[in-house]
Structure formats: C-alpha cells, structure tokens
C-alpha cells in the first residue's frame, strides 16, 4: 500500500495569504511555491489520451509510470532505507547492521479547486516533502538522534510537468530533489536534500526488477472497487553517498533502500482510522511488504502484501492471509500517542517479529501534510531472535484519525 499525503486541512492554509514572520521557520519555508514534477505520465503537455486516467485495471508502463499522475487525487514517491559507514568503491554489503535510517518522501495531491482557472497562482496541485534521518547511536545515548524536516508548495512558479518520454523524471521542491536517470537495465536515482540540521546526498542503484504490488500493480484497499491504487515497489536498492549532521563531519555511507510509488483516488474507507505497513529488504536478497488498514478498535478493515524470494518468485498475500499482532507499545511524550513498535507478523511466506531499532521515530508533519505519524527503521527477526532483514515500519492513525 503506502503512503500518504495526509492533506486534510492543508488546502486552505496554502491558498490563504500569510506573513512569513507569523509562522515557524520551517512553515515559512514551506509556503514558497517552487515545486517541480518532471516526467508526468499525464499532463497538460501531452494529449489527454496519452495515458489511461485514474485508477483502473491496466498494465503499468515504464518509464512513463515512474512519473506523475496528476489526474488522480493523491500520489507519493517514498524512499526509506538504512545506512552504515564505509563509502568505498566496493560492493554495497546488504548484511551490514544499520547506523542510520532515512526517509525521503514527495507527495502530490490534486485539490479539485480552480480546475478551469488560467492563473499561475491557482492551487490545482499541492506538493509536500518529508525528510528524516535517525542516528541510531546518538538516539540510544540521549534521544537526540532523530531529525526531520518538511516542506509544502502549491502549483506554479516552476511546478512543471513534461512528458515521460523526455527521459529523466524529477520530483523536486526547491532544492530538495529525487531524480531518476533513464537506463536500459536498472533504476538509478539521485536524492539531494539539505536542511538546517542535516543533509543527504545519495545515489540509489537498482539490483532487481520492479515489484508490482497487488494484481500486477492494481492494489485493492477495501471491498469497494473504488478503494484501490496503482502501486509498485523497488526493493533492494543499493545506496552510496554522504550524510551530514550539523556540527559533525560528513560521513561516507552505503546501505539498502526501498522505493514505493503509489497513486489513488480513494484510499481509506469511511470507518478506517489509519494503517500499519512494513517494507523489508531481507539479507538473502528477498523482499517483504505487508499492510493492514485499521478500524478504531484495532481490527483490520483490509490487508495485503507480497513476498519476493531472492530467486524472483513472487507470492501475493490475500486480505485474509496477513495478521499484525502488537507486542509492545511506546508512548510519545509529546503527543501521548501510543505506537506499537514491536509486532508479530504472520503471512503465507512466514511468521516474523518486527522490532523498531529506536522507539522515538514519531514525525510531526502538521507544518505540511497536517498529520502526526510514526515511521522508523526496524529489524525483521525470526521468532528465535535471529535478524533476517532491515527496513521500515509505518504507523498512522494513532495520534488521531488520518484524513486523506
């Protein structure tokens, strides 16, 4: 499934004139409308019938579907991963234990407003970005290892959509960017983010093919056929680059990452509160994804997932075949939200323990998408405690119902 431009309440905020002096620094920065999405799969620069519109049972087409789909309500490009020191020229070792976890996410939402306006200021599309870095050693010592930042912008002033056939796809919000290079054999992405307290400059290289989630990229999110998305993943991305923290020298790092790209017109059912999601790169080269949408009483309204073995054999999970069982909760001292940070996860591919590598990985994004959620680097372990992979756990709807 995945991700999540939790945008309720943000449209009026971005439409209204605001004094930069009247908001916090990160919110003032967010108001600058300088967003760009290049490589759109459907845009005003291509014919209306160039791509199927909306979410339908269709074959995904690449490289076009790496780009934006502005005819849909919500869309995200979501990269999470783990890093460790050692940026030499050798092969990236997927078995090295994490020193850092990182998240870089770009969201796009179609507001449904000013659709016929010719004004460059019309907020037809909004773009948001979240970035986070967790230093596991620093976090274990003093709780100060978790850093994050956010931005938001409305369409206009450099928000550009160009045909995917032009080659390179770019998702950019001012100087934060995720750029995909066209290559014949595998994905190659470049991420550049600089915040006041940290910076990331990462190169990601595909080691496997695209993983189409659900029914060949059509992912059901509920019993209503309208509750669906187009969804694909790129697991086992080899990462190489640099991490900087304020007051510390830059570190050369390598690691592994997971990319999700998903777009939808309707996600949550009326009674759903939020969701739980995991994406793990296993040490043997396999990939595991599982999710459940959740009612207020904690029961699942829908679920799904997939497991692709190191040999490339794909198993897709039915809604009734995935079970999340919370084992331990951490309560945020800031919001009092209680997040399950350890789980027993049962799927047709196996039964595992999901364990957060640091409890405090709560993200307050009320300055952009209006939500508070938990997103953190975690380990996937056998029931006997042996680690079989690393990845990310995402928990939404614990600090209040999520509204898309």
Model-derived regions: residue spans:
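Structured soluble/peripheral alpha/beta segments that form catalytic or ligand/cofactor-binding pockets
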Residues: 22-404
């Amino acid at each position: 499934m995945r991700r999540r431009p939790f945008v309720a309440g943000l449209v009026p905020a971005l439409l209204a004139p605001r004094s930069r002096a009247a908001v916090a620094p990160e919110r003032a920065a967010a108001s600058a409308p300088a967003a760009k999405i290049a490589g759109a799969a459907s845009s005003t620069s291509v014919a209306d019938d160039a791509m199927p519109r909306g979410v339908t049972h269709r074959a995904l087409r690449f490289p076009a579907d790496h780009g934006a789909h502005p005819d849909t309500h919500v869309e995200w490009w979501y990269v999470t991963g783990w890093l460790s020191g050692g940026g030499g020229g050798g092969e990236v070792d997927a078995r090295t234990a994490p020193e850092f976890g990182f998240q870089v996410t770009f969201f796009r939402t179609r507001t449904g407003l000013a659709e016929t306006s010719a004004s460059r200021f019309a907020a037809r599309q909004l773009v948001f970005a979240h970035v986070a870095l967790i230093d596991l050693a620093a976090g274990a010592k003093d709780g100060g290892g978790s850093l994050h930042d956010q931005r938001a912008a409305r369409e206009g002033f450099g928000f550009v959509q160009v045909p995917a056939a032009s080659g390179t796809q770019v998702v950019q919000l001012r100087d934060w960017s995720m750029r995909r290079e066209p290559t014949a054999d595998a994905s190659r992405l470049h991420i550049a983010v600089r915040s006041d307290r940290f910076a990331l400059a990462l190169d990601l290289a595909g080691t496997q093919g695209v993983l189409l989630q659900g029914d060949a990229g059509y992912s059901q999110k509920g019993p209503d056929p309208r509750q669906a998305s187009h969804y694909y993943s790129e697991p086992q991305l080899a990462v190489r680059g640099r991490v900087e923290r304020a007051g510390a020298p830059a570190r050369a790092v390598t690691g592994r990452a997971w990319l999700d790209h998903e777009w939808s017109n309707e996600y949550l059912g009326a009674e759903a509160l939020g969701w739980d999601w995991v994406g793990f790169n296993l040490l043997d080269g396999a990939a595991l994804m599982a999710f459940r949408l959740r009612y207020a009483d904690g029961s699942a309204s829908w679920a799904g997932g997939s497991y692709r073995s190191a040999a490339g054999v794909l198993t897709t999970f039915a809604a009734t075949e995935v079970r999340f069982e919370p084992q331990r909760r951490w309560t945020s001292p800031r919001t009092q939200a209680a997040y399950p940070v350890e789980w027993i996860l049962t799927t047709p591919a196996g039964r595992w323990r999901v364990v957060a590598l640091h409890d405090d990985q709560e993200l307050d994004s009320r300055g952009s998408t209006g939500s508070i959620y938990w997103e953190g680097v975690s380990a996937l372990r056998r029931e006997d405690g042996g680690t079989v992979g690393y990845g990310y756990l995402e928990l939404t709807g614990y600090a209040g119902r999520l509204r898309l």
